A protein has these predicted regions:
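ABC ATPase "signature
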Residues: 220-221
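Helical segment within the ABC ATPase nucleotide-binding domain
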Residues: 176-188
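Conserved ABC ATPase "signature" region
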Residues: 104, 108, 115-133
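A short, surface-exposed alpha-helical micro-motif characterized by mixed small hydrophobic
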Residues: 202-204
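Catalytic Walker B motif of ABC-type/P-loop ATPase nucleotide-binding domains
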Residues: 162-166
Length: 245
């Protein structure tokens, strides 16, 4: 067994984040290994984005430990960040830049050089199907293309772990299908955690569900078990939250 297979690629150990007396998340724990695609499911405001920001080192936990590929993201963030690609829901894309400009900028920031830099840019442009918009201003692209530009940017340094916050939010059905296909392809050899409150996304992309409600992990298991005893995903959502979806 390889080191990647042995070591959890994403690990939350008793994560809590407090703002005064309010617990945005409380005692959240789970592990994801190489090749897993997990959907972080829950209603708006449940704690999905907060957990992701703590996992990626953008927020420090009030308690607990977040690890990426074995690296503590509070004390060893740089080492963990080299293994991580993080796509926030509304990441900065610099609307006056073209996708080519943006990818060159981030490739330089990641220390990619020469032939390797050119090859990586070419590979992510192909993977994310950006070839015919590569020279257009990002601000003039559709939301679907902007999302693909963001995905290409986080893939440049060949991360082992991808964390994506609402990757299909605001996309039309065709764009959603394309993003889903890309994520499934990437999940063959990477570890992916994606947040959503859209139940169809769970069945379409993820083999595992992490369901969070009011800052606490309410379910962690296979997608098939989430819809247990013949219940639909909508029924399980209501059962766990008391809310319709």
């Amino acid at each position: 067994m390889t080191d990647k297979a042995k070591t959890p690629m994403i690990e939350a150990i008793g994560l809590s984040k407090y703002y005064g007396d309010f617990a945005a998340i409380e005692n959240v724990s789970f592990k994801l290994h190489q090749g897993e695609i997990a959907a972080f499911l829950g209603p708006n405001g449940a704690g999905k984005s907060t957990t992701m920001k703590v996992l990626t080192g953008y927020l420090s936990p009030s308690a607990g430990v977040a690890k990426i590929a074995g690296h503590d993201m509070n004390t060893d963030r740089l080492a963990g960040a080299t293994r991580l690609g993080y796509l926030p829901e509304n990441g900065p894309l610099y609307p006056d830049m073209t996708p080519r400009d943006l990818l060159n900028f981030f490739a330089d920031a990641r220390g990619l050089e020469g032939k390797h830099k050119r090859e990586r840019i070419e590979e992510v442009v192909h993977l994310c199907d950006l070839g015919h918009v590569i020279g257009k201003a990002i601000g003039k692209l559709s939301r679907g293309y902007r999302q693909r530009v963001g995905m290409a940017q986080v893939l440049l340094h060949e991360p082992d772990v991808l964390i994506m916050d609402e990757p299909t939010a605001g996309l039309d059905p065709n764009q959603i299908r394309e993003v889903r296909n890309t994520i499934r392809k990437l999940g063959e050899n990477k570890t992916i955690l994606l947040s959503t409150h859209i139940l169809q996304e769970v069945q379409a992309m993820a083999s595992r569900v992490l369901f969070i409600n009011e800052g606490k992990l309410a379910f962690d298991g296979p997608t098939a078990e989430f819809a247990r005893q013949g219940a639909s995903l909508d029924e399980r959502f209501y059962e766990l939250t008391g809310q319709t979806h």
